[in-house]
Amino acid sequence: KKITEAVHRHGTKVFGQLFHPGAEVLGTDSYGTRTIAWAPSPLNHERCFATTRQLTPELIEEIIKGYAITAERMIEAGYDGVEIVASHGYLPAQFLSPLVNQRTDCWGGSRENRQRFLLDVARLLRQRLPASAIVGLRISLDEKDHLGVKPDEALAALAALEAESLVDYMNIA
């Protein structure tokens, strides 16, 4: 709270970013222990520093709840809002990409299913945060990577978020 209070004294708003690297986690932690890169689907790609494992539906739900818990703590710490990071190949972008997300369950396949992770995160934030909390989204319009999110996928996700008024602003990377 010290930092947010100091910033507020100068009339400035404070936001925190919420992100999960998914497949883009580093291969080892600071102790040299091999890390697990959880992703929508198993992935072998030069952007991945560790072998990926497919997320189970239970882990997906746990991660979504983790976004909300973290956002609640940030608001309690004096942040004015949070920004969901769905850019630069992080986990929400991995779910959006039909080349990365090759699931056949409710989390993959159709465009609507691939959007489910991002929409469920935003819906839960709206449910659990006070109305005064600002919720934003950072998304890459075109990741310029053969496995990355393409403009049509990003624009469709933005339209779905807008249709439900789930975010207050969009930060296009």
Enumerate the language-model features and the residues they cover.
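Flavin-dependent oxidoreductase catalytic cores
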Residues: 1-173
